[in-house]
Amino acid sequence: MLLLIKYTLLYGIVLMLVALGGMFSEHSGIINIALEGIMVIGGVAGVLTLTMLPADMSPFLVVLISVLVAALAGMVYSLLLAFASINLKADQTIGGTALNLLATAIAVVIAKYFSDSGSAKLNYSNKPFLFSIGGLELSIFVPLGIVLLVISYVVLYKTRFGLRLRACGEHPQAADSVGINGYKMRYAGVLLSGALGAIGGLAYIVPPVQTWNFEVGVAGAGFLALAVMIFGQWKPFNICAAAMFFAVFKSLANIADSTFLAQLHWSSNIYNMMPFIASMIILAFTSKNSMAPKAEGIPYDKGSR
């Protein structure tokens, strides 16, 4: 049971953070398919920072610097999507897909350049990111994720910025008529998405293991986070609940050999498939009732009415 809780929280927080990032982007009117790529960029930036920091540095500073660098890298990378979608009015789905493909290539090149073995694997210490409570080893991203969840809710529903962001995702022309700059708000939404997605990427890669092969990217976690966002109806606390639900399925692959599931003699690949199969089944029944922002995916033209 402790193992199930451990891995559910581990993967649930990752899915929640990335889905929250997608939520901000889509509430501004931009569909961020590039979450998978943003996770990879955030992961490689954070891991590379980890390898360069002094071994005797305070664990708090190690975590802080790594997270900030990852978030900054994600924001910079997300600017590519923002520029293509907002300024060039390019198709957001195609642009996001291209960035997903580019991210893995960039990460592999960077990893091979800095790796001692010349492979795409980077070794690092994950000890600063782990702590124990009552014999349960948890990731530092668990409390950080809870804090970011609350902040996301407050920002989205209790601030003027959040109101303006949501207005731009529902009817940007109406928002413009009352003096809200739709272009700036969409940029802000995508940048927030980049920061949270990149932190989620670092949270996915670092806590479980001490080496990562960037040729595998993040194994579809970004796409699963999109399903979590839709299932959570673009609302922070609903997204958290959906993330934990899908994380239970994801956790089965890690605990199967140490539970009664070992008697089934199933391959771990079957358990790894479960969250994706569950997402397809659930979305097939719930997508008709989804309340997506009305203007998402539609290029904003200030002159159109």
Label for each model-derived stretch:
Residues 152, 170-184, 257-305:
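Cytosolic-side transmembrane-helix boundaries in multi-pass membrane proteins
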Residues 212-276:
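Transmembrane alpha-helical segments in multi-pass inner-membrane proteins
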Residues 137-213, 236, 241:
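Helix-loop-helix "hairpin" substructures at the membrane interface of multi-pass membrane proteins
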Residues 24-45, 86-99, 164, 209-223, ...:
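Short, non-helical or kinked segments that cap or interrupt transmembrane helices
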